[in-house]
């Protein structure tokens, strides 16, 4: 930390603590012209290497998005929405496409540095917003990784028990977990072992981990295609009538549930520093992986609801039991293999993204510099990667993290909403920078206020919908959001991004719709998730006040691009 000592020792010499906190919290990264080619280096002098092609990026996004849920969630939602679950996935997919358009623009604008939503919000807004986004995302990632590893352990045990010699002989602490101290603790050995193996793979290098992800993702995609093709011959179109037996509200509610089945395409944005041609490939990878996922989910929905009447679908393993009822038990075995492959890739990519986020904050000084170190020969953020594996391993090994699932998704929705807001804010900054050097212009402030109003309207509409309030209140909330969006559209001028990268169409309307729907979904989460958002935000602010503001590296405020060509160093 020696490089920051001089800065830290003088932190209170020129201003009060509050003024220093305010100045630090509100500073942001600058975005130089696209011609800047300054390389990003770690504290050890080494950098990541560019080894991911377009196909690797698409498989990365698909690997992160499609887990075991494709075999379970489809049937669970179909029990309420009926065959209309297809529309639920279509609506949720359309919403994710809008979010993906925002990610695609920003990944094209920041094509050479890791950080994703954290980096975008640091440049569009300020330092403390970026830190809060990171903390909310990271809590989701850590708990999610632990939960997925436990699910993977359970599926792996179930797959092993298909062999008669092993059936019933595998102890609980290897699979679902053995409860101790009245359920306060839940011992699981296999989950940390699986996490250790995947962490080891990720530490070996991006080429090796990408190869593992590609093989496992291809396996599960092939299995899903086999399921769709085999099931297509068993479809009875009479099962699709009535298409929405419980009305459109059940279909819409289903869309709010299945939305999270698409989460993962944003992982592509965090591979910016390891992509061979980031400005071209990142937007295509984000959109391409999402479209693949939408197609697969809709295909599974049509097959599942066509094979079995929705009212007879099983809650635990709907797809497997649907094929078993048709005498195709071999497909059920394939589904188990596909579930293991799906959970493996979801976990692998999740751990990968976590380490790159830690790397970004370590470089900026918001976390200890050890997180910014890159191994000189493996070219991976070794310390960050091992730390992510340890945190997930401890959580998965001794806690029943499944009980925390109801407070997840807060970070994801927060990240998506902030990214959409970043598109608008950066476009405003572009216009402002060309006309004035004053960052805090009234035009920029008015734009941010409109974004906040849209977010509040989305939350209000979500709460009214959740508690079945009069439709008038929902319409009023929508009306307020429409007015705020209209103000953004007619009173603001937006400059296209500098350079020849991808530009999100329909700005500011598309980002506004994203923010409204994301916060609408936020309102559907368990009330404890709302409490978690507030508590974590307060704690994160305290950590920033005590550590971040003093250790953030001012020299990193100038955005620096990594080399734009592949390196095999």
Swiss-Prot record:
InterPro entries assigned: AA/rel_permease1, CAT_C
Residue ranges crossing the lipid bilayer per the database entry: 53-73, 81-101, 113-135, 155-175, 181-201, 215-235, 250-270, 284-304, 333-353, 406-428, 444-464, 467-487, 502-522, 528-548
Native species: Arabidopsis thaliana
Cellular component, GO, one term: chloroplast membrane
PANTHER family associated with the record: CATIONIC AMINO ACID TRANSPORTER 9, CHLOROPLASTIC, INNER MEMBRANE TRANSPORTER YGJI-RELATED
Similarity section: Belongs to the amino acid-polyamine-organocation (APC) superfamily. Cationic amino acid transporter (CAT) (TC 2.A.3.3) family.
Span of chain positions assigned to the transit peptide in the UniProt entry: 1-41
Membrane topology: Multi-pass membrane protein
Function summary: Permease involved in the transport of the cationic amino acids.
Protein name: Cationic amino acid transporter 9, chloroplastic
Source organism superkingdom: Eukaryota
Gene: CAT9
Molecular functions per Gene Ontology: transmembrane transporter activity
Keywords, alphabetical: Amino-acid transport, Chloroplast, Membrane, Plastid, Transit peptide, Transmembrane, Transmembrane helix, Transport
BP terms from Gene Ontology: amino acid transport
Main location class: plastid
